[in-house]
């Protein structure tokens, strides 16, 4: 059994990207093999990993097991028995004060974390020494901040003085009165409308949503930090607000803060101007959950990055959860310090892709329903087919349709929709051409554009050509025969094969998915 798993792991390590292997395969362990029943049991450390590995890798592991034993093997995925023991220990553990972790040290057990959550307070760690900023550097980082105070929601006086944390398990319900709820939302800057319940899920965001729920259920334990990246309007901000809102319901008194990266930069500038870094650090280092949006705005701002690094280290050491969003993969954010990039990579990084057709339809139907409008599926499909980039664009188009319908006193139909979105559809149709896709893909994979039309079949040419066909089908209104004609007169079945092949591989191969994401963002400008 162990020999097989070493063999299997070695093969999968070669087949998968390092991130895929470390995230999904390395944590697995074989726990039982029944030769008489031809069954192999493999344990996963938590339910989230178990479900994902079962859905994404069970087929490949079963194939490798069959090849190894020369007979069909039923591979069963089970929850690590030690996880159950840890969970039981957590429920029985007495309350204990927090024990800060050293950065990079071993992860705390579930029992220790559960005990920490019951502690009423613990001293926050002292921040590393501040590095002075030269006047010229300060001027370079100045953001025309106004004279308002630093945007730090007020803390109770005794907590502010002691830098104490007050995360206590709550009754799983909202605050008892509206005033208290308003105060909580004012301090946290959360949008109470953005919840898991009204987040539309599809293939493009299912992993991100699953990870977000896991973090909301086990803050500071499961994935820290959680880093979500993707283009504008794909739901990153919705998801992180949903995590914060869920935590407010589950844990009364949790100290939560949502902040856009630009506001954080502004806070750093004002703290420097007023020599108020002690207050700044006391506030940010004492949070239980920090949600920071669009961290790419930290690019080139060295003092902000330095302060955020200190805050990050203090929060993670105290088992507080950090969640970050960006418009691109961490290592591709320019102007960010390497030590911050390495901290981002230490947790779980998940992409949110543009929504697929069915998801776009569901978003439109859900949004129309919330507006009290009965939108037909025909209209929803028409809009979803023509607008592909992001959720925000879809919602904007729907608002335009509703306003046009109301103004003209006509029922919503495909004809009315075409009229209402005339300008938008014209822009969309001329934005991306098959020729542009071919050139962009050829440049990306370092081949000639002429190779897109040629009959050459080496892998280094055939693969980019298939990717270009897939993108042509996804990003233009061309039919399969039309796309085939533009790729050297190929038959539509060749295009269909390429589209299906790349779509299937995209769902399994993180590296390919990332490359397609980059190409799509490049083509959409």
UniProtKB/Swiss-Prot annotation:
Residue ranges, compositional bias (Low complexity): 169-181
One annotated Gene Ontology cellular component of this protein: plasma membrane
Stretch list, region Domain III, AAA+ region: 189-405
Binding residue positions for ATP: 233, 235-237
Region (Disordered): 162-182
Gene Ontology biological process: DNA replication initiation; regulation of DNA replication
SMART domains: AAA, Bac_DnaA_C
Residue numbers spanned by region Domain IV, binds dsDNA: 406-525
GO molecular function: ATP binding; ATP hydrolysis activity; DNA replication origin binding; lipid binding
CDD domains tied to this protein: AAA, Bac_DnaA_C
Subcellular localization, as worded in the UniProt entry: Cytoplasm
Keywords in alphabetical order: ATP-binding, Cytoplasm, DNA replication, DNA-binding, Lipid-binding, Nucleotide-binding
Region named Domain I, interacts with DnaA modulators: 1-71
Chain segments carrying region Domain II: 71-188
Complex and partners: Oligomerizes as a right-handed, spiral filament on DNA at oriC.
Function noted in UniProt: Plays an essential role in the initiation and regulation of chromosomal replication. ATP-DnaA binds to the origin of replication (oriC) to initiate formation of the DNA replication initiation complex once per cell cycle. Binds the DnaA box (a 9 base pair repeat at the origin) and separates the double-stranded (ds)DNA. Forms a right-handed helical filament on oriC DNA; dsDNA binds to the exterior of the filament while single-stranded (ss)DNA is stabiized in the filament's interior.
Protein family (similarity comment): Belongs to the DnaA family.
Name the record gives this protein: Chromosomal replication initiator protein DnaA
Organism: Burkholderia cenocepacia (strain HI2424)
């Amino acid at each position: 059994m162990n020999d097989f798993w070493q063999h299997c792991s070695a093969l999968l390590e070669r087949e998968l990207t390092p991130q895929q292997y470390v995230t999904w395969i390395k944590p697995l362990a074989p726990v039982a093999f029944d030769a008489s029943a031809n069954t192999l049991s493999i344990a996963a450390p938590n339910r989230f990993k178990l479900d994902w590995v079962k859905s994404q890798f069970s087929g490949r592991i079963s194939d490798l097991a069959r090849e190894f034993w020369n007979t069909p093997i039923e591979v069963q995925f089970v929850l690590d028995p030690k996880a159950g023991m840890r969970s039981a220990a957590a429920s029985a553990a007495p309350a204990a004060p927090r024990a800060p972790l050293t950065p990079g040290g071993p992860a705390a057990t579930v029992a220790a974390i559960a005990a920490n959550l019951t502690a009423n307070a613990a001293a926050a760690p002292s921040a590393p020494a501040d590095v002075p900023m030269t006047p010229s550097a300060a001027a370079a980082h100045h953001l025309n901040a106004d004279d308002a105070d630093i945007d730090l929601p007020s803390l109770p006086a005794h907590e502010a003085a002691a830098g104490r944390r007050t995360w206590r398990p709550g009754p799983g319900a909202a605050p008892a009165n509206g005033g208290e709820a308003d105060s909580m939302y004012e301090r946290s800057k959360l949008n109470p409308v953005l919840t898991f319940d009204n987040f539309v899920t599809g293939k493009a965001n299912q992993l991100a949503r699953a990870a977000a729920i896991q973090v909301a259920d086990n803050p500071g334990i499961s994935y820290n930090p959680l880093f979500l990246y993707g283009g504008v309007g794909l739901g990153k901000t919705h998801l992180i607000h949903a995590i914060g809102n869920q935590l407010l319901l589950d844990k009364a008194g949790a100290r939560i803060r949502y902040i856009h990266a630009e506001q954080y930069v502004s806070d750093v500038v004002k703290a420097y101007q007023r020599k108020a870094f002690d207050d700044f650090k006391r506030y940010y280092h004492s949070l239980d959950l920090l949600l920071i949006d669009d961290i790419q705005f930290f690019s080139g701002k060295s003092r902000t990055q330095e302060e955020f690094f200190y805050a990050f280290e203090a929060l993670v050491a105290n088992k507080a959860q950090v969640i970050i969003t960006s418009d691109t993969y961490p290592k591709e954010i320019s102007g960010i310090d390497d030590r911050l990039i390495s901290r981002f990579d230490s947790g779980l990084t998940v992409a949110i892709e543009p929504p697929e057709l069915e998801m776009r339809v569901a978003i439109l139907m859900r949004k129309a329903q919330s507006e009290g409008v009965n939108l037909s599926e025909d209209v929803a499909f028409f809009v979803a087919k023509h607008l592909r980039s992001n959720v925000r664009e879809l919602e904007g188009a729907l608002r335009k349709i509703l306003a046009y319908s109301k103004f003209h006193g006509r029922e919503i139909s495909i004809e009315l929709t075409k009229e209402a979105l005339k300008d938008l559809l014209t822009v969309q149709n001329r934005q991306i051409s098959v020729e542009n896709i071919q050139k962009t893909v050829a440049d990306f994979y370092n081949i000639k554009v002429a190779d897109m039309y040629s009959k050459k079949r080496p892998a280094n040419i055939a693969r980019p050509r298939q990717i270009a066909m897939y993108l042509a089908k996804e990003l233009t209104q061309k039919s399969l025969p039309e796309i085939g004609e533009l790729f050297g007169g190929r038959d539509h079945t060749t295009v269909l094969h390429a589209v299906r092949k790349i779509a299937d591989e995209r769902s399994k191969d993180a590296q390919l998915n990332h490359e397609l994401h980059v190409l799509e963002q490049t083509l959409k400008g």
